[in-house]
């Protein structure tokens, strides 16, 4: 792996308290590293360290394999980077002048400035707005100009700090799609901070989860969202049903787990007597009428429960079902209507033995690792 940026044993202290503790983090050349976490997790602090804007209290930062010397002038290194933020922060000038500004500071000749600024405005779909005053642009148009202004510099690293959070959903989705295409086509090394899981999935080659100033997991998006390494990560990435039970049987890689008197089959090699913690995502469940006890599917688990809450979740409905413990499932509005789902009504919940993701498994009675 060719790392552009690396942190080793990096700590930031404020008022005697550690607000950032990163044992190791690398940013690989050409990748988009998405950093997600709740507000106050330390994401922006981490971004400022990676961008060489703030010096850590402890630890080292490497850029292109060299240890950053904080006593030396850092402007030459910072000029190899670019940023875009939640607010576009455009100058009171035309869209073209805003994109051209950094090139003028670098002393490029006018023909080169015209060519590069025009090229990037066009790539972000705002070439026709080149002569518009920035103050007359919509939020989405202004953010496209801000991103063009950053990428026109051809930075070695692009930093994005919540660049979509102030946009409405249709505008945000369109810009995420367009930016993702550009970053992939040009292999732009990018560190992208967001609290939106769907944005991390759409853009990230890898995703880092931050909480309380620490990075808890770094992984490919599909693996992180399907296989979080802890309960805290699982809850943050949307694993809404987390259950704990005792293994009461095992056969051919399928453990029978007792949870609040219910038997659940889980694809894992935990041995009888062990306690496991596992999670299920809302989309793992299939809902059916109580009469459909013999569902024509490969699901090995069928639980009868009562709907305690049914509420909208975007284009779908989110159903909270009490099966002796609570499960959260997603269902289409059409399915809910055809099944006659309503709060207080009964429903059959089905899911495969491969759906549960084991978050923790205790040792068995012989002390063997599960």
Where does each model-flagged region fall?
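Helix-to-loop junction immediately C-terminal to a conserved catalytic motif
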Residues: 51
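Glycine/charge-rich catalytic "coupling/switch" loops of P-loop NTPases
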Residues: 261-311, 330-370
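A short, proline-enriched helix->beta-strand linker immediately N-terminal to the Walker B motif
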Residues: 152-156
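ABC ATPase NBD coupling module
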Residues: 67-82, 105, 224, 228
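Conserved ABC ATPase "signature" region
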Residues: 111-129, 180-181
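The feature captures the beta-strand-to-loop junction immediately N-terminal to the Walker
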Residues: 36-38
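Conserved ABC ATPase signature
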Residues: 133-137, 141
């Amino acid at each position: 792996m060719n790392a552009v940026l690396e942190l080793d044993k990096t700590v930031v202290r404020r008022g005697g308290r550690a607000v950032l503790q990163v044992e190791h983090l690398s940013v690989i050349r050409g990748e988009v590293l998405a950093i997600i976490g709740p507000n106050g997790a330390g994401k922006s602090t981490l971004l400022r360290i990676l961008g060489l804007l703030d010096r850590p209290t402890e630890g080292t930062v490497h850029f292109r394999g060299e240890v950053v010397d904080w006593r030396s002038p850092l402007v030459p290194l910072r000029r190899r980077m670019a940023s875009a933020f939640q607010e576009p922060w455009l100058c009171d000038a035309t869209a073209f002048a805003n994109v051209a500004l950094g090139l003028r500071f670098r002393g490029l000749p006018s023909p080169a400035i015209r060519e590069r600024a025009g090229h990037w405005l066009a790539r972000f779909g705002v070439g026709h707005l080149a002569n518009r005053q920035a103050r007359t642009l919509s939020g989405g148009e202004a953010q496209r100009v801000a991103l063009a202004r950053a990428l026109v510099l051809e930075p070695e690293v692009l930093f994005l700090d919540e660049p979509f959070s102030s946009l409405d959903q249709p505008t945000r989705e369109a810009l995420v799609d367009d930016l993702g295409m550009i970053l992939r086509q040009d292999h732009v090394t990018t560190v992208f901070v967001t609290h939106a899981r769907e944005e991390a999935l759409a853009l990230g080659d890898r995703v880092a989860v931050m909480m309380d100033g620490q990075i808890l997991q770094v992984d490919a998006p599909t693996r992180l969202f399907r296989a979080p390494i802890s309960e805290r990560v699982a809850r943050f990435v949307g694993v809404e049903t987390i259950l704990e039970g005792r293994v009461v049987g095992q056969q051919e890689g399928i453990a029978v787990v007792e949870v609040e008197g219910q038997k659940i089959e889980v694809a894992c090699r935990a041995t009888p007597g062990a306690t496991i913690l596992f999670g299920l995502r809302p989309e793992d469940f299939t809902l059916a009428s109580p009469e459909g006890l013999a569902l024509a599917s490969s699901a090995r688990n069928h639980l009868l429960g009562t709907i305690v809450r049914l509420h909208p979740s975007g284009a779908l409905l989110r159903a909270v079902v009490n099966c002796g413990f609570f499960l959260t499932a997603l269902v289409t509005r059409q399915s809910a209507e055809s099944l006659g789902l309503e709060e207080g009504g009964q429903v059959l919940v089905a899911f495969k033995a491969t759906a549960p993701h084991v978050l923790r498994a205790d040792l068995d009675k012989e002390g063997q690792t599960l």
